Amino acid sequence: MYHSAKRRSSSRLMMFIIALIIFIFGLGLNLSVGASDISIIDSLKYLFVWDGSKEQLIISTLRLPRTLIGVFVGASLAVAGALMQAMTRNPLASPQIFGVNAGASLFVVASLVILPASPYSSVIFAFAGAAAGGAIVYMIASSGGMTPVKLALSGMAVHLFLSSMTQAIIILNESGEDVLYWMTGAIDGSNWQDVITIAPFSVIGIGLALVFSGSVSVLGLGDETAKGLGQNMNGIRILISLIILILSGASVAVAGPIGFVGLLVPHIVRKLIGEHYQYVLPFSALFGAILLVYADVLARWIAFPYESPVGIVTAIIGTPFFLYLARKGRNLK
């Protein structure tokens, strides 16, 4: 048993090192790809050595903020998805499928129409919309007994309804073209203000998730077992819900509703390292950042020299996976 645990620990360490190398290479690749070709080595060098060149200005003012937004948004959505799947014990749970992203998007778009644009007001409205979307889904799914498939279907119905309301606002708004592009999930055009906006929420949210990862693992044991272990289940669920709202709301506010990151990444992580959330959450953050960084690179390559929203790439990757899980969901109890 000791040797088995030691092997698992060594396997996780090796996997973390490999993932970290892939992540660092992805950062360099993300900084180097664009209209101006810059080598990966030079891209990483310009982060530490200032020479005032045009290439360095491109990286420092355009590509580095965009890359950091990809890291923060990818990590935040992946951790939010892992927390939702743990709290609901539903493998189909994610911020997009449960109406959280759609609610946040609706409130943000409505605020942009009514109020002057402000990054922090957008975050506040995103939090409120995420909470409203999640609450509506929970109320619908819990009536008459909640099941994983019922929860997923309720989430998709609310997601479609809220998304249609958002589309209606965009159509009726004269300046809706820019908002429509944001709705596809886009991080191109990100700036340092966006980084400053999301960074504290992402760091605090992921930090809290890691601190309470042990309690998250207990949720998977069922309410009776968790109560027997002295856990306050209602308190844990409220705390996890707040963390999910922080991570999802901040991500939507700066990047739009990017889908499938929160669904795809936790499944991959659990397949690789097991069900213990002390490991699932930090690996989800790392894998989520990797997914969105590389998806952003693909978004620049698909229609080069034009750029596609990164949300389109994650949808192409995630849709077949969601259909696979939904098909398996017929057998979920």
Curated annotation (Swiss-Prot):
Belongs to the binding-protein-dependent transport system permease family. FecCD subfamily. The keyword S-adenosyl-L-methionine does not apply. This is Fe(3+)-citrate import system permease protein YfmD. GO terms for biological process: siderophore-dependent iron import into cell. It comes from the Bacteria. The gene is yfmD. The lineage of its organism: Bacteria, Bacillati, Bacillota, Bacilli, Bacillales. The complex is composed of one ATP-binding protein (YfmF), two transmembrane proteins (YfmD and YfmE) and a solute-binding protein (YfmC). Keywords: Cell membrane, Ion transport, Iron, Iron transport, Membrane, Transmembrane, Transmembrane helix, Transport. It is a multi-pass membrane protein. Pfam families: FecCD (PF01032). It is found in: Cell membrane. GO terms for molecular function: transmembrane transporter activity. InterPro entries: ABC_BtuC-like (IPR037294), ABC_transptr_permease_BtuC (IPR000522). Part of the ABC transporter complex YfmCDEF involved in citrate-dependent Fe(3+) import. Involved in the translocation of the substrate across the membrane. The chain crosses the membrane at residues 13-33, 67-87, 97-117, 121-141, 151-171, 201-221, 238-258, 279-299, 302-322. One of its GO terms (cellular component) is plasma membrane.
